[in-house]
Amino acid sequence: MKMKRLALLLTVCLAFFGCKQKPVDGAQLLKILNDENLSLVVSNHDSISRHASPRVDDLMRILTTEPERLKGAVVADKKVGNAAASLLALGGVSEVHTNYATHSGKRILEQAGVKLVYAREGDFIFNNDSTGQCPMDSTLNGIADHNEGFARLQEKFYNK
């Protein structure tokens, strides 16, 4: 708790005196994500935001309420499949670091010109029961347009 307060105090002091924080690279963001058991870390506009919601909930919220937060951002995401990759591409991030990327997620980010750094790559992300593909990713199978993908996810999972 003391470390969080100290970090906050340092950030406030730096902002007050017009100093900028030293840019954080993607490897550092991934370390933060893993060390703090988060699902998403976003670095942009001289600030870092930490998120711990399941699935792509935080990406959907950011795209809906503050899309400028992702434009040009460096992001660490726990797993990147179709859904996360499409949302990250739609948001205009510049770089993504992840522990695991699917082949299709990797392809989506490459086509969008997003730099991707990953530890492992595989066919798909499993659903919660480990019996098949993640339902969010399967919702976007065959959808190339990121706006359409966002709308489908919104309709199927978030408009209830």
Please describe what each predicted stretch is.
Residues F17-G18:
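C-terminal motif of bacterial Sec signal peptides marking the signal peptidase cleavage site
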